[in-house]
Regions:
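Short, Lys/Arg-enriched N-terminal segments with co-localized hydrophobic residues
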Residues: 1-3
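Short, conserved acidic/polar surface loops in the N-terminal third of protein domains
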Residues: 78-82, 100-107, 156-159
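A gly/proline- and charged-residue-enriched helix-loop-helix capping module
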Residues: 93-143
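Non-cysteine beta-strand/loop elements that form the S-adenosyl-L-methionine
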Residues: 91-103, 171-182
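Short secondary-structure transition/capping segments
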Residues: 17, 101-106, 190-191
């Protein structure tokens, strides 16, 4: 697998711009769904049952603590494909109530010297309803966390309504939530870390959760650059 990637797939993908290569990778994953035994082969290679890695956190039993963070499966369409690679959970999104295009292109840049990518997509996604339709159609075979955010066109004073809307639509179809208030690529989003905005968002989600029979953990995605004083 490594040899094939390094000497065949990587040169092909690197001949395209990063976003096109990203989309081609997902097209490849879709293709593998129709290849007999492809999923079984991937699970055999990457998915290992290791009892010592199992964790009980937030009332959820995780097969292992290594998950796929939000930002890759933006629309909640590849959670089972990603599970084949052995992830203990998959975070979908960020998802917003309405579809949005994200930032203008180009918005993804390779940094070969650091073997890294700079991501400035800006929460492009097809919207919560699209994700819900897919979750209804394809039952998750992995723990799914929904990363939710507000639409870029929504002013911060109305942000809590966006989070409420996304939360309510997704509640019955995912295992946990991540409230995204820290994407630096979206103008004004990090301002939601201010306690006045944040307390309104969290209070509304906690109140809304009380109406459901099943408990869903709510996690908060904050900026990694906040000081301990700011976090307090």
């Amino acid at each position: 697998i490594y040899y094939m990637y390094k000497h065949i797939l990587k040169p092909i993908l690197f001949s395209f711009n990063p976003e096109t290569a990203h989309n081609m990778t997902f097209a490849g994953l879709k293709f593998l769904r129709y290849v007999p035994f492809a999923g079984s082969i991937l699970r055999g290679l990457y998915k290992k049952d290791t009892p010592s890695l199992e964790k009980e956190v937030f009332g959820i039993h995780f097969p292992n603590p290594v998950g796929l963070a939000g930002g890759l499966d933006k629309n909640g369409e590849f959670y089972n494909d990603m599970a084949n690679f052995g992830f203990g959970f998959v975070e979908i999104g960020s998802l917003t109530p309405q579809p949005q295009d994200g930032n203008p292109k180009p918005r993804c840049f390779r940094v070969p010297g650091d073997k890294a990518l700079i991501n400035r997509f800006g929460i492009n996604n097809k919207g919560v309803k699209n994700a819900v339709e897919h979750l209804k159609k394809v039952r998750p075979e992995v723990i799914v966390a929904a990363n939710i955010s507000k639409n870029s066109t929504s002013v911060n004073e109305d942000a809590a309504k966006d989070y409420e809307s996304a939360f309510a639509l997704l509640y019955d179809f995912v295992d946990m939530f991540v409230v995204n208030i820290s994407c630096p690529n979206v103008v004004g989003l990090t301002a939601l870390q201010d306690m006045n905005f944040l307390s309104d968002i969290i209070d509304r989600l906690l109140s809304l959760r009380m109406y459901y029979d099943e408990y869903r953990p709510i996690l908060l995605k904050v900026s990694p650059d906040l000081s301990h004083e700011q976090l307090d």
